[in-house]
Amino acid sequence: MALLTTGKSFIRTVEKSGAVAVYAPLEGGFEGRYVRRLRCSGYSVVNLTARGLGDVAAYLTQYHGIRPPHLGKKDIAGSGAAVGLRYYVPGIASYQLENLPQKSKGIILWIIEGFVLSRQEQEYLVSLTQDNPQIKVVVEMGGDRQFSFKPLADLLV
């Protein structure tokens, strides 16, 4: 890999395909450079981990219920379960799109540990970018000796 790369081919691939699978060296550092290049080209980047996402569609685009850590507290309703109250929050992608700056091209959902996503969840990420062109997805699928990327749709074939 060249010492200095501009990242233009990566940005073009993200803009063209919408969802990109990334393989980065395990020692790290490369993904930060590409995140910076995406920010400089006009995107807002949201970092997520694939572990614990649950229902990907609900987490990204719909209002969904969450429970904060209960810390041993009992439920106020008197059921006796140590589960706590349920709070409803908007989806991450929907909320970020509503608060997007005027000059921004859109948002990039940078998802680490993407190898835990099922095929159906990966297909949803591809269809999400096709349905809403302001949302782009970059999924880190694993490690490699050099930074490489390809459209996520090609990985599903």
Curated annotation (Swiss-Prot):
Record keywords: Membrane, NAD, NADP, Plastoquinone, Quinone, Thylakoid, Translocase, Transport
Main location: membrane
EC number: 7.1.1.-
Catalytic activity: a plastoquinone + NADH + (n+1) H(+)(in) = a plastoquinol + NAD(+) + n H(+)(out); a plastoquinone + NADPH + (n+1) H(+)(in) = a plastoquinol + NADP(+) + n H(+)(out)
Cellular location(s): Cellular thylakoid membrane
Highest taxon above the source species: Bacteria
Family classification: Belongs to the complex I NdhN subunit family.
Chain's role: NDH-1 shuttles electrons from an unknown electron donor, via FMN and iron-sulfur (Fe-S) centers, to quinones in the respiratory and/or the photosynthetic chain. The immediate electron acceptor for the enzyme in this species is believed to be plastoquinone. Couples the redox reaction to proton translocation, and thus conserves the redox energy in a proton gradient. Cyanobacterial NDH-1 also plays a role in inorganic carbon-concentration.
Protein's UniProt keywords contain Chloroplast: no
InterPro entries named in the record: NAD(P)H-quinone_OxRdtase_su_N
GO MF, one annotated term: oxidoreductase activity, acting on NAD(P)H, quinone or similar compound as acceptor
Family annotation (HAMAP family): NDH1_NDH1N
Membrane topology: Peripheral membrane protein
Key word NAD present: yes
GO cellular component: plasma membrane-derived thylakoid membrane
Assembly, per entry: NDH-1 can be composed of about 15 different subunits; different subcomplexes with different compositions have been identified which probably have different functions.
Protein name: NAD(P)H-quinone oxidoreductase subunit N
